Design a protein with these regions (language model features):
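Positively charged, low-complexity/disordered segments
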Residues: 391-397
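Extended, folded cores of ATP/NTP-driven motor/assembly subunits in large transport
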Residues: 1-390
Length: 397
């Protein structure tokens, strides 16, 4: 900065320079908007300088078709599964309904002929599979993933702990009777590519050996043609329109049908649950503080009643209900080996047109209202929320 300028002039010049440089925190390309630093071949993803994740794909279990006793047993096993996660492990459950190219499915179900007498049987079976495909889920592929992550100072420190957690989780899935598979780096990139290219059916072509030869990064092989945010509640990802919403849970309890109804929608969408276990001591301390505040409010209401000449035992029903619920929760935490979890429930609806998108968002909102909850669309936070669905177990909002 020239020394002959006054302090006010120097400040003015610096303001112009900063404006020209732009905000370094704003993504300048589609690649910059993909929220991770590096993907390793073994499936470990470095999201930030000190945060690392892995992803497991898991299959369905016949919960809805099971008898009541079996459903109770499955639910108890699932509770034990969730209690495995301590406060140092963040995890994300992702449920994806994505439209796929019908021609690829037809190739998968086509049974090649062989030099024997069973070709007529193969033809009949292939025809039956194609007929079922045509009557199926509108070409939707429905998959489920669990992504878990930890904080560590380096890859060397993170890797052994992630492997240990992975082994425990795979054993927990096995006890539930659920088939599960760890995704390697290429499979995670393929999955993210499919998420970014929902509407164009662009094929994923990638090999690790291409990186040093081309000078490209893995993000160049998965990024869409671009991201755009034309309106405060809508974003564009390539040729697809999308909208992010969060579930506002206002019901006293949630039915296990809520998630099923979301996933039964016949449209491409991603439902994500970001879950963080709260440290047991902090959870108990927080509940005790809440009970103390409720008791203080109760005393204030009783004082008002006495001054007004009313019965002091008559207090607002909300106070009585909240106090009862808080004490029940404290008992569960202290004596029943329960954990407290923080949950963010996100829904990404999509559509090939804005009108189709709005129709799908309306349907999802109707499902939420059916269970006395609200689906709230985020104003001016579509990009941050969209990043939170990318299987990195890092909630950005």
């Amino acid at each position: 900065m020239p020394s002959h300028l006054s302090a006010a002039e120097q400040k003015q010049v610096q303001t112009v320079i900063d404006r020209a440089r732009g905000d370094s925190t704003v993504p300048h390309s589609a690649q910059d908007s993909i929220p991770f630093q590096r993907m390793f071949p073994d499936g470990i993803c470095r999201v930030t300088d000190n945060y690392y994740t892995k992803t497991i794909q898991f299959q369905d279990i016949n919960y809805q078709l099971a008898q009541q006793e079996d459903q109770t047993a499955i639910f108890e096993e699932w509770c034990s599964f969730l209690n495995f996660f301590d406060s140092s492990i963040r995890f994300e459950l992702s449920f994806m309904n994505m439209a796929t190219d019908a021609s690829n499915f037809e190739k998968m179900v086509r049974i090649p002929y062989q030099k024997d007498h069973f070709n007529p049987v193969r033809t009949e079976y292939s025809t039956m599979l194609r007929r079922q495909l045509a009557q199926g889920n509108n070409g939707l592929t429905k998959t489920k993933y669990l992504t878990f992550g930890i904080e560590a100072e380096s890859m060397k420190q993170a890797k052994p702990r992630l492997i240990h957690i992975e082994i425990d989780l795979m054993n927990n899935f096995k006890r539930l009777g659920v088939r599960a598979k760890l995704l390697n780096g290429k499979e995670r990139l393929h999955l993210m590519h499919d998420m970014f290219h929902m509407g164009d059916h662009d094929r994923f072509n990638f090999d690790w050996k291409w990186l040093p030869e081309s000078g490209l990064s893995v993000k160049d092989f998965i990024a869409p043609t671009g991201f755009a945010f034309p309106k405060n509640r809508i974003f564009q990802m390539g040729g697809m329109y999308g909208s992010m919403s969060y579930l506002q849970i206002t019901a006293s309890d949630l039915s296990d049908q809520l998630l099923k109804d979301f996933l039964d929608m016949e449209s491409s969408q991603i439902v994500t649950m970001h879950i963080q276990s709260v440290d047991q001591n902090k959870a108990i301390k927080s509940i005790k503080h809440t009970i103390t505040e409720l008791d203080r409010s109760k005393i204030e209401e009783q004082k008002k009643a006495v001054r007004s000449g009313y019965d002091m035992d008559i207090i607002p029903s909300d106070l009585a209900t909240y106090g009862k619920d808080a004490k029940a929760l404290l008992k569960e935490l202290q004596s029943q080996n329960e954990r407290m979890f923080l949950l963010t429930f996100l829904v990404m609806n999509t559509g090939e047109t804005e009108q189709e998108l709005e129709t799908n968002v309306f349907q999802a909102s109707s499902i939420a209202q059916k269970y006395n909850c609200n689906l709230r669309r985020l104003d001016f936070q579509q990009e941050q929320d969209r990043k939170s669905t990318r299987l990195n177990s890092s909630h950005i909002l």
